Amino acid sequence: MSGRLVHNSVSDDVTLTVTSTAGSYAATNMQNKQPSMKWRSTTDAAQTISGDFGAAEVIGCVVLYNHNISAAGTVAITLASNSGFSTDVYTKTVDALDATAGYGTQKYGHDGYGGYSELGWQQRFTIIWFTPVSRRYFKVVITDTTNSDEYVEVGRMMWGDFTNIPYRYGAELGWREQTEVTRTRGGALRSDARNPYRYTNVESTILTDAQVADALEIFRAAGRRSDVLWSGFPENTDEYLERRYTMLGKLMDYSSSIREAEGSSI
């Protein structure tokens, strides 16, 4: 198995140009590492977000996280070497969300819903993977003209390259509970109802020297300070499997490189 790790969002330091902005929901909120801070448009008309990296950057992934784009919406990205988007153009258009699966579509017990997947439980994020290209100018066009909110909003946007991390079977995925339960003087149980958070724990297989160097650089540059995107099954034909093993979060613990007989693992 091989996952992908994205950590260096080169769009965080550029000036973003957007079609519209509602009140204090500024475009700079998409560059904040707290996805609860959002950019919001004034209407549900097609919205364009564009910028200039300042120099050619290698891009292989675009992330829109914590958005309200509906299943009817689309996201189109464009990269180019000139501001007019006419030279060395790369484009890709995807559906904003995976299709909703009805009864009988998934295997029995899928996600605890007895074979039923409905829009309400889906996390609102869109990940666009592609073969990395080097370009200077970028834009994304969000088209969702029937959005029930009558506006479009995005909490986090990332443009960057990805590092392939092959990993062993036995990878963990679960929820960490932060709620503390105490007993009152009268004997009743009381909880402080804190929100749980999702986590994954991965051990790599044997890595190439280049992969080790990339992973260690991510640990140094991002550490616990920045956000990273992890996808355990990128571009998998089972889109529901890919969504379950994709998360935007922080590296809470990571090990050093261990040199083995065949190579290195982390």
Describe each region flagged by the PLM.
Residues M1-T48, D52-E57, C61-T74, A80-I266:
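Extracellular/virion structural assembly segments
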